[in-house]
Design a protein with these regions (language model features):
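N-terminal hydrophobic targeting/anchoring segments and the immediately downstream early-domain regions
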Residues: 1-145
Length: 145
């Protein structure tokens, strides 16, 4: 049997973990480390999308709290998952049998025009931002707007 590498370009698991106070290792969401073990070598973009979260807090605050929660989950599961910022880091993680994790923001309302939060996101490992989800924000709008 051929063992293929899996690279999933998107999941909303980080925000849901925070909202539901669930662990990354074992949860009822789309991605759990325990279930993903059977994949063998894999990489995952973990996306933070605040657009659809009921806004009891400002979107940047939701993002910051979810990012902190997910960072704690990554540290707690460091034997199974590695935060990657480059292709070479991903290759090293997968060669060691760990998930190569990349962070993404889906919809710029998570950072708005807050350069400080954008810098913090980059420092914490965010390497991809899609400017819009399905709603207009202060930086961009979807084509149907």
């Amino acid at each position: 049997m051929t063992n293929y590498r899996v690279f999933d370009g998107h999941c909303d698991t980080p925000i849901e973990l925070w909202l539901q106070n669930q662990p990354l290792l074992e949860n009822t969401l789309a991605v759990s480390l325990a279930r993903a073990q059977r994949l063998g070598t894999w990489a995952q973009f973990f996306a933070f999308c605040t657009a659809w979260v009921e806004a009891k807090l400002p979107r940047p605050e939701i993002f910051a709290r979810a990012l902190d929660y997910f960072d704690a989950q990554l540290r707690e599961n460091a034997d199974k998952i590695t935060l990657c910022r480059t292709a070479s880091e991903a290759e090293a993680a997968m060669q060691s049998g760990k998930c190569a994790a990349f962070l993404a923001i889906e919809g710029a309302e998570a950072v708005r025009e807050d350069e400080g939060l954008l810098e913090r996101a980059y420092e914490m490992g965010v390497r991809m931002i899609s400017l819009v989800w399905n709603l207009p924000n202060s930086l961009a709008a979807p084509c149907g707007s």
